[in-house]
């Protein structure tokens, strides 16, 4: 029975007891009401707990106040606690350090509370109570030690065996006290009741924001059998952000006035809490709060067993029932990122500490499993009636009847009866019932979805869902970043939660603006044992315009694998070098099949893109950091290491797809057909920062039209190659890199109309579109581009070893570069042979084996393209372009290049206005009385008077000065003289040719700001080699059949017919076959000789050799070629709106700095067919050829077009050999009907105006044969072949032609203008070039000057002393050179006659000039593969090196040596001429000596005297003629040296004219 004390003693006793309880050590007695007795009551007002003595793990208690706390303790041991307005403010600790001396212990507080309630004996005084302090502290330390070891566990065990062993040495009184306290505590706990109202817990993570947990009411009651009942009403969790408008708070104002009071009341509080308290109570500061509701729990009822004794705080048989939970996920996503960082950091600290407890260790759990030690008496049951997640303003998720049951061995069973996904905008709900059944056993979570999951999403729902996913991803990145920053080494074997998932069929239905998308998935199965998620099939269906569902994507056999250890996949880098991709997530897909219409796909893509753009419209752009170190892990390997270096790339996820098949129906439009895309052996890697890596082993794109397949991109796989075809990389900042290898791209001109229409539509749609920041870098290696023309069947292939394309769409610039390109051509793509399976060394060899012919190469090409609102501008620079063509391949190439564009033709109704609406009176504006006598006056009667006459100079030009003519001028003649004398010409008069003909485009042509296409092509060097023979099998076969037909027809002639009557046949408009019956056997031999240069063989030739010749016949070289094209769109105008103004549709300018045509015919001794006339006055730097072509539309309302042409050509030097001329005519006149371009509406180009400058020509012509049949037919041009021209001069006069109907009429018009002019005024220059008359005319002119000059001087001054020497000097200067040249020609002619005579008598003839040696001192094959020139001669006479090292560049197997002119390699001066003359004479004498010596040697073998005489007779002509040949050659060399000494200009002329026999002249062998 309690004893009674005075009120003041009771308070003092209570104060002492409360000071022993750490929580109440700061209690003020003035706020305490005490009543001790059988029903003791304690009333506390405005209690501020001592927070310094409260130390929770990772938690710092900043403030703890209770407005009203009532404690009632009865004699029976019932403890009732009731409180109101409880506020607790805590803050997580930044560091994880804990001080064990200040740890809060619930047991310690309970012991202190119990000690104050003990019924002490009457002799008990306060001193004895003080003496008990030491023993009590020791016991408290034991309690603290035991609680610190398991303070983080769910079950709190106060009693610890280690503490019992330690306390065995304590005194007996202490043990008795301890036992008494435990009994009292156990009694109190068994009858403990508590009720708290208005409980608020504030968790401060930042100075301006905190988490507030508010509870309306908490009730704890006891039931029999140690059952506790906890009822919690209305739990609410808010995020509160404080906003203080006043920027500065005075520190002095925050401090209390009474320092002692401050020390007693606020000593344990931080400066923040003092400031917060001051803010809350200071009326001068306006405090606002931004509050977000995160979680609301309506009513919770918790029943548990435990807390029965002080020795056992275990909680078991826990039964939790929750009525309603409301979670605002959208408010959670609005929390500040820094605040979320602090929350995650605090949670990580708690998780880390809980993992460090002994019971959570791996060893303890293994010990628990091995010994079958499970806490079977603990049970947990959780029931939640309703859970609502407010995901977004449009989305909410409702869960009903959630049940969790814990069974034996810590196994849990979870049931979720119903899930409802609500669209708050349309009030549509998706209900899934029964929804989920889950099991948790041994850290394995098994999820079984019990019904089919059919989801339905509308547009607003999808937008909200995407936005939520993005925000969630942002929060997860924040969490992962925080987690990785505090990441500790992972303990091996630590158990993580494992999952197993099984679903029914899953479908997602998305409603867009005008369509639905339905995604159907087979059951999803995930097994944690294999770490694989498997889906057998996924189907994507669409019903555009709300029509019938149509399947367009099918995904087969999807397997997603998760691995704790890195998975390595083989990949390739940008250099196609092997590397490794490393990941822990691998997705394998067997097949993806896509079938859809293209226009539907565009609509679907637009709808999806609109939703994505709207969902991400308000998202701020995230700045991506450069991360490169984590992508490549390399190891430095020394030379001695045997490890093979392999680059490694890290990836978040790798997707492996065996096959991708895509088909786009009605691609672009119905005319295109279907587009089929195929990808095999694909690998896709998803990296950080949204980087993507992809490779494909094979790639193909085909066009499918009317069941016929047209390849657009095909893969060229070599059997030896394992490299991928395509590598794709998406980098940060919208950078795309594409690497392509071993593919063939096809260009079809027939697709241009479709693409042009598509491009027009895209321009209309994207006219207002903004430029995107996109960078594309494409590297193409070992790739072929096939060009297919519009109407004909040939194909041109360009093979690139390496092609680079870079595009910057922000700047609208594109760059293309390739170093080497090879050109191949075929006459019919259908004749291409089937490729063999044998590996090929190069791509060019692959196509050569399939029937293509190599026609050229192109090197170092750079293309720059720039686009803007005005149009497209492209600039192309090419270092060199080389072509090797035959007549048929040249014709094929030209037709193909023309046919690569769209053939645009129009009917006459669209081109011309053929109907006149009404009669036109042509005399309507004619003054019929203009020429009446009344209007005609005599010239003498003309008087200038009355008014001043103003002559305006700007009438013809832009001058604005006016000249006033005085009235006093009486006559026109006097006026003219006075005007000339008064106006002196101070500046030279500048005359502008063709001023009147100049067209002012500003006044006649309509220019507007419109789109244009500008193309500029610069080629430094173009080499075109023209070969004889034919590339195509069709051509060769046609010619062979024609030759055989002619042979058969002429053999069928009767015997009495004329044997010399010829039979003619023409094929391909250029090949003329003629033979007679007597010469039919030599027909094929002559053809071989003309084409291949083969000598006439002895024997029958079964087949003519029409293959391309082994060496080219003519070489065309062009240097610094510039082509500038500017095109404007053809804007169709309505006739009523047309102003009948002209419009320029396109303009082409072609400029060639220098060009030459090299003669390499075996029968020609001349070198340059066409070159620059060096000695004419032509400005330096002016191009040899310049032209301009303008295509104009005279009337805008009509489609008729006309051409304006202008040519400017430099003076030309021509060396024309008849054989070369015949070859060029035969080459360029070749026409194959297979390549004729036939338009729907044939049109002849009308040339509105043609202008050309005056061209001077210096002509050398060497005829070889005369066509007498042509003469008999009336072809007078054959008379030219009777004369050899040497330096004939003629001039093609400048001309202007108007209204020419086509190029054939242009040729006739030029002939009609130039021929009469040459005949009438230039015959002197031509006759002066006739070879037999040239020297005589020149000498005659010199003799004429010898006489005329003295006579002229005598008439002037009457003296002859000075005029005669002057005339003699002129005569010697002009005639001496001609005399010398005439002598040299006579000597060379004599040498040629002697060589022919010697050859007639069995000598070597002209072949004796060079001595063939068996050794090949120069391998021409190494210089040029196509020419294969072999042979040469390098003679030595008595150890003297020859003057010139001779190469016979045209000598072939079964071929003839090239004919070299006697005028080639002339000595440069007199000294060199005499030296060459000496060596020539010596060499020929040595030849004669060897001939006689060889005959003498053979005479010893001969037995018959007759044979000896015959042998001597054969040797005699050679011995006699060969020295004469040497003498004439020596004389010729000496005279040539003298001639070149007198005239140095002849040296350059001879180099241009004659082929050189020296090795220095490499043009003919390159």
UniProtKB/Swiss-Prot annotation:
Disordered: region residues: 137-178
Keyword list, A-Z: Autophagy, Endoplasmic reticulum, Lipid transport, Membrane, Protein transport, Transport
Record's compositionally biased regions (Low complexity): 142-162
Protein's UniProt keywords contain Transport: yes
Membrane topology category: Peripheral membrane protein
Keyword Cytoplasm: no
Compartment(s): Preautophagosomal structure membrane; Endoplasmic reticulum membrane
One Gene Ontology term, aspect cellular component: phagophore
One BP annotation, GO: autophagy of mitochondrion
Task performed by this protein: Lipid transfer protein required for autophagosome completion and peroxisome degradation. Tethers the edge of the isolation membrane (IM) to the endoplasmic reticulum (ER) and mediates direct lipid transfer from ER to IM for IM expansion. ATG2 binds to the ER exit site (ERES), which is the membrane source for autophagosome formation, using basic residues in its N-terminal region (NR) and to the expanding edge of the IM through its C-terminal region. The latter binding is assisted by an ATG18-PtdIns3P interaction.
Protein name: Autophagy-related protein 2
Source organism per UniProt: Vanderwaltozyma polyspora (strain ATCC 22028 / DSM 70294 / BCRC 21397 / CBS 2163 / NBRC 10782 / NRRL Y-8283 / UCD 57-17)
């Amino acid at each position: 029975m309690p004893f009674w004390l005075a009120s003041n003693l009771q308070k003092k006793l209570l104060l002492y007891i409360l000071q022993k309880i750490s929580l109440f050590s700061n209690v003020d007695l003035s706020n305490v009401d005490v009543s001790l007795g059988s029903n003791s009551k304690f009333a506390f007002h405005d209690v501020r707990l001592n927070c310094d003595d409260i130390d929770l793990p990772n938690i710092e208690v900043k403030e703890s106040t209770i407005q009203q706390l009532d404690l009632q303790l009865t004699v029976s041991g019932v403890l009732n606690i009731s409180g109101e307005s409880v506020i607790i403010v805590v803050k997580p600790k930044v560091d994880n350090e804990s001080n064990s001396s200040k740890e809060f212990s619930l047991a310690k507080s309970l012991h202190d509370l119990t000690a104050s309630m003990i019924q002490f004996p009457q002799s008990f005084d306060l001193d004895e109570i003080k003496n008990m302090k030491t023993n009590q502290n020791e016991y408290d330390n034991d309690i603290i030690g035991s609680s610190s070891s398991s303070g983080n566990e769910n079950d709190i065990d106060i009693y610890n065996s280690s503490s019992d062993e330690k306390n065995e040495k304590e005194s007996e009184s202490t043990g008795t006290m301890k036992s008494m306290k435990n009994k009292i505590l156990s009694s109190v706990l068994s009858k403990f009741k508590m009720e708290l109202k208005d409980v608020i817990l504030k968790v401060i993570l930042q100075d301006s924001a905190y988490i507030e947990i508010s509870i309306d009411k908490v009730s704890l009651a006891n039931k029999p059998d140690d059952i506790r009942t906890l009822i919690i009403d209305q739990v609410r969790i808010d995020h509160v952000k404080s906003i203080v408008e006043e920027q500065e708070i005075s520190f002095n104002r925050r401090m209390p006035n009474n320092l002692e009071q401050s020390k007693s009341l606020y000593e344990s509080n931080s400066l923040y809490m003092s400031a917060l308290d001051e803010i809350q109570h200071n009326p001068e500061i306006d405090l606002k709060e931004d509050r977000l509701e995160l979680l609301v729990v309506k009513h919770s009822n918790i029943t548990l067993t435990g807390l029965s004794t002080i020795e056992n705080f275990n909680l078991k048989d826990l039964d939790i029932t929750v009525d309603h939970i409301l979670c605002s996920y959208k408010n959670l996503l609005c929390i500040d990122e820094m605040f979320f960082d602090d929350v995650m950091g605090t949670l990580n600290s708690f998780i880390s500490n809980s993992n460090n407890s002994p019971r959570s260790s791996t060893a303890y759990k293994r010990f628990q499993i091995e010994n079958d030690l499970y806490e079977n008496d603990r049970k947990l049951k959780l029931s939640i009636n309703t859970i609502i997640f407010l995901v977004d303003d449009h989305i909410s998720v409702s869960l009903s009847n959630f049940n969790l049951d814990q069974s034996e061995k810590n196994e849990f069973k979870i049931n979720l009866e119903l899930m409802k996904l609500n669209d708050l905008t349309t009030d549509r709900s998706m209900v899934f019932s029964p929804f989920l059944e889950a099991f948790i056993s041994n850290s394995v979570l098994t999820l079984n979805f019990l019904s089919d999951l059919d989801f339905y999403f509308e547009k607003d729902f999808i937008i909200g869902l995407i936005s939520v996913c993005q925000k969630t991803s942002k929060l997860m990145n924040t969490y992962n970043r925080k987690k990785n920053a505090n990441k500790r080494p992972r303990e091996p074997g630590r158990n993580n939660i494992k999952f197993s998932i099984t679903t029914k069929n899953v479908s997602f239905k998305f409603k867009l603006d005008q369509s639905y998308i339905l995604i159907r998935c087979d059951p999803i199965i995930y097994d944690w044992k294999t770490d694989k998620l498997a889906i057998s099939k996924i189907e994507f269906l669409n019903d555009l315009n709300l029509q019938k569902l149509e399947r367009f994507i099918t995904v087969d056999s999807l397997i997603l694998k998760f691995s704790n250890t890195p998975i390595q996949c083989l990949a390739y880098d940008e250099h196609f070098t092997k590397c490794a991709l490393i990941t822990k997530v691998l997705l394998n897909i067997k097949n993806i099949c896509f079938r859809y219409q293209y226009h539907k796909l565009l609509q679907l893509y637009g709808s999806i893109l609109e939703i994505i753009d709207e969902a991400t419209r308000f998202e701020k752009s995230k700045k991506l950091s450069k991360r490169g170190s984590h992508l490549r892990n390399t190891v430095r390997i020394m030379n001695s290491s045997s490890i093979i270096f392999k680059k490694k790339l890290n990836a978040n996820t790798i997707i492996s797809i065996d096959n991708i098949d895509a088909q786009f129906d009605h691609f672009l439009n119905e005319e295109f057909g279907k587009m089929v895309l195929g990808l095999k052996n694909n690998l896709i890697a998803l990296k950080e920062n949204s980087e993507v890596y992809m490779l494909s082993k094979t790639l193909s794109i085909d066009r499918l039209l009317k069941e016929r397949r047209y390849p657009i991109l095909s893969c060229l796989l070599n059997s030896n190659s394992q490299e991928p075809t395509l590598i794709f990389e998406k980098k940060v900042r919208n950078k795309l890199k594409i690497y392509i290898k071993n593919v063939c791209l096809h260009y079809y001109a027939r697709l241009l109309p479709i693409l042009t229409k598509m491009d027009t539509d895209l321009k209309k749609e994207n006219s207002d579109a903004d430029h995107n920041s996109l960078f594309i870098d494409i590297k193409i290696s070992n790739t072929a581009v096939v060009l297919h023309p519009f109407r004909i069947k040939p194909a041109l292939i360009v093979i690139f070893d390496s092609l680079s394309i870079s595009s910057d769409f922000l700047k609208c610039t594109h760059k293309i570069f390739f170093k080497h390109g090879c050109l191949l051509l075929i006459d019919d793509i259908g004749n291409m042979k089937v490729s063999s399976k044998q590996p090929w060394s190069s791509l060019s060899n692959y196509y050569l084996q399939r029937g293509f012919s190599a026609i050229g190469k192109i090197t170092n090409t750079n293309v720059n393209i720039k686009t803007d609102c005005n149009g497209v501008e492209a600039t192309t620079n090419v270092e060199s372009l080389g072509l090797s063509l035959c007549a048929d391949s040249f014709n094929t190439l030209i037709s193909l290049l023309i046919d690569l564009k769209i053939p645009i033709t129009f009917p006459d109704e669209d081109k011309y206005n053929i109907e006149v609406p009404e009669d036109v009176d042509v005399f309507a504006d004619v003054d019929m009385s203009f020429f009446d006598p009344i209007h005609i006056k005599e010239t003498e009667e003309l008087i200038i008077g009355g008014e001043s006459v103003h002559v305006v100079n700007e009438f013809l030009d832009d001058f604005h000065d006016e000249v006033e003519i005085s009235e006093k001028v009486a006559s026109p003649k006097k006026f003219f003289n006075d005007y000339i004398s008064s106006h002196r010409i101070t500046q030279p008069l500048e005359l502008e040719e063709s001023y009147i003909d100049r067209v002012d485009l500003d006044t006649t042509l309509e220019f507007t700001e419109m789109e244009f296409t500008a193309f500029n092509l610069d080629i430094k060097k173009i080499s075109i080699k023209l070969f004889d023979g034919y590339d195509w099998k069709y051509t060769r076969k046609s010619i062979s059949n024609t030759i055989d037909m002619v042979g058969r027809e002429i053999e069928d002639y009767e015997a009495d017919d004329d044997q010399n009557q010829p039979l003619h046949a023409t094929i391909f408009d250029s090949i003329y076959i003629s033979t007679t019956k007597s010469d039919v056997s030599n027909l094929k031999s002559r053809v071989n000789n003309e084409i291949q240069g083969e000598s006439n063989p002895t024997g029958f030739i079964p087949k003519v050799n029409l293959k391309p010749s082994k060496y080219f016949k003519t070489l065309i070289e062009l240097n610094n070629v510039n082509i500038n094209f500017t095109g404007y769109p053809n804007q169709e105008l309505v006739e009523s709106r047309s102003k009948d103004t002209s419009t320029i549709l396109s303009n082409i300018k072609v400029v060639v700095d220098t060009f030459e045509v090299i003669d390499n015919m075996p029968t020609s001794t001349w070198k340059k067919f066409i070159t620059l006339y060096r000695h004419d006055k032509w400005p330096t730097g002016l191009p040899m050829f310049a032209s301009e072509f303008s295509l104009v539309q005279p009337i805008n309302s009509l489609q008729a077009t006309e051409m304006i042409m202008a040519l400017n050509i430099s003076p030309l030097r021509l060396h024309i050999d008849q054989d070369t001329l015949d070859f060029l005519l035969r080459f360029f006149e070749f026409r194959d009907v297979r390549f004729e371009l036939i338009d729907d509406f044939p049109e002849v180009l009308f040339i509105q105006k043609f202008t050309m400058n005056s061209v001077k020509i210096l002509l050398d012509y060497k005829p070889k044969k005369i066509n007498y049949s042509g003469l008999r037919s009336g072809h007078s041009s054959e008379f030219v072949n009777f004369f050899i021209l040497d330096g004939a001069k003629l001039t093609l006069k400048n001309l202007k032609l108007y209204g020419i109907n086509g190029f054939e009429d242009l040729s006739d018009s030029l002939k009609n203008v130039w021929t009469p002019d040459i005949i009438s005024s230039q015959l002197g220059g031509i006759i002066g070039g006739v070879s037999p008359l040239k020297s005589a005319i020149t000498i005659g002119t010199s003799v004429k000057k010898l006489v005329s000059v003295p006579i002229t001087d005598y008439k002037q001054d009457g003296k002859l002393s000075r005029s005669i020497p002057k005339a003699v000097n002129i005569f010697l200067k002009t005639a001496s050179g001609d005399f010398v040249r005439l002598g040299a020609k006579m000597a060379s002619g004599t040498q040629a006659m002697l060589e022919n005579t010697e050859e007639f008598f069995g000598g070597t003839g002209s072949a004796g000039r060079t001595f063939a040696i068996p050794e090949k001192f120069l391998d021409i094959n190494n210089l040029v593969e196509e020419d294969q020139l072999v042979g040469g001669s390098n003679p030595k006479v008595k150890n003297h090196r020859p003057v010139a090292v001779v190469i016979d560049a045209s000598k072939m197997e079964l071929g003839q040596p090239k004919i070299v002119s006697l005028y080639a390699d002339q000595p440069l001066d007199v000294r060199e001429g005499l030296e060459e003359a000496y060596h020539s004479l010596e060499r020929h004498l040595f030849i004669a000596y060897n001939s006689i010596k060889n005959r003498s040697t053979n005479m010893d073998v001969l037995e018959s005297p007759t044979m000896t005489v015959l042998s001597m007779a054969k040797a005699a002509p050679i011995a006699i003629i060969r020295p004469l040949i040497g003498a004439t050659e020596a004389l010729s060399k000496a005279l040539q040296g003298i001639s070149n000494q007198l005239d140095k200009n002849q040296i350059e002329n001879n180099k241009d004219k004659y082929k050189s026999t020296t090795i220095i002249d490499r043009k003919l062998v390159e």
